[in-house]
Amino acid sequence: MPKADIHPTWYPEAKVICNGEVVMTVGSTQPEIHVEVWSGNHPFYTGTQKMIDTEGRVDRFLRKYGMIDKNKKKNQASDAKEK
């Protein structure tokens, strides 16, 4: 005999919300799904070039803990002046 009440609740009309606006409904185990980017505003699907400002995890870690090599930046600047 299978166990009773072990499956999550299924919401056939779950709302997908982007920027406070309901963009679509899908079936899900959550009643609301909040997203930052979806196919309606993604640059690939809309054909627009939009820069999404993200930085790599390593860069963010190095900047956070002050491990960025400052000499490297100075060397790059002096190399650019020589050219």
UniProtKB/Swiss-Prot annotation:
A molecular function GO annotation: structural constituent of ribosome
Source organism, top-level taxon: Bacteria
PROSITE patterns reported in the protein's UniProt record: RIBOSOMAL_L31
Pfam families, per the entry: Ribosomal_L31
CC per GO annotation: ribonucleoprotein complex; ribosome
Record keywords: Ribonucleoprotein, Ribosomal protein, RNA-binding, rRNA-binding
SUPFAM superfamilies per the UniProt record, alphabetical: L28p-like (SSF143800)
Matching InterPro entries: Ribosomal_bL28/bL31-like_sf, Ribosomal_bL31, Ribosomal_bL31_A, Ribosomal_bL31_sf
Gene Ontology terms describing biological process: translation
Keyword Zinc-finger: no
Similarity comment text for this entry: Belongs to the bacterial ribosomal protein bL31 family. Type A subfamily.
Subunit structure comment from the entry: Part of the 50S ribosomal subunit.
Entries under PANTHER family matching the protein: 50S RIBOSOMAL PROTEIN L31, CHLOROPLASTIC, LARGE RIBOSOMAL SUBUNIT PROTEIN BL31C
Reported function: Binds the 23S rRNA.
Protein name: Large ribosomal subunit protein bL31
Phylogenetic placement of the source organism: Bacteria, Bacillati, Cyanobacteriota, Cyanophyceae, Oscillatoriophycideae
Gene designation: rpmE
